Design a protein with these regions (language model features):
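Helix-biased detector of long, well-ordered alpha-helical tracts
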Residues: 1-158
């Protein structure tokens, strides 16, 4: 992941309250060009931008197209701090809920959430992003590795 999640939630809060989040603006105005160049130089051949379907939706689509599954380490996923607070205060866009429902309905029992992962954390993974980061299958310096692919189908979050 090349950018933190949470922009959609903060945009939703902004619409409701007028609160402005400079960290969200910075994320949305940062281009993916440098990350894309680094990914190309690292030999990465599978990537997508995380936008309207959220991380989970885009990850599901990549996995389905490639015939693989994925494991996500929630503690490694970058999230804007204000988004965590906003989710706990109920500022959850309807689109994020629909994204999560769509992934769950497509994966059924192959969508698994570990006991230590909260509902708030899962909804953050489904948050629709504006100018989101890149989800890469591989590793580039300076960006967190949030999980890995596997031959077993489905998505597991721990």
């Amino acid at each position: 992941m090349t950018k933190p999640l949470g922009v959609g939630i903060l945009n939703n809060r902004h619409k409701a309250t007028g609160d402005v989040f400079p960290e969200a603006v910075e994320s949305m105005t940062t281009l993916n060009r440098e990350a894309a160049v680094a990914a190309t130089q690292a030999g990465i051949t599978a990537a997508t931008d995380v936008t309207g379907f959220g991380l989970l939706g885009h990850l599901f689509k990549m996995c389905r197209a490639s015939g693989v599954g994925a494991r996500i380490d929630m503690s490694a996923v970058p999230v804007l701090d204000a988004a965590r607070t906003s989710v706990s205060e109920g500022f959850i866009p309807g689109g994020s809920r629909r994204n999560l429902d769509w992934v769950k309905s497509n994966l059924a029992e192959q969508f698994q959430v570990g006991a230590g992962v909260s509902d708030d954390e899962v909804i953050l993974l489904a948050d629709a992003q504006t100018s989101g980061g890149l989800l890469l299958v591989g590793e580039i310096p300076g960006h967190p590795v949030i999980g890995y692919t596997t031959d077993e189908p489905g998505i597991q979050i721990s």
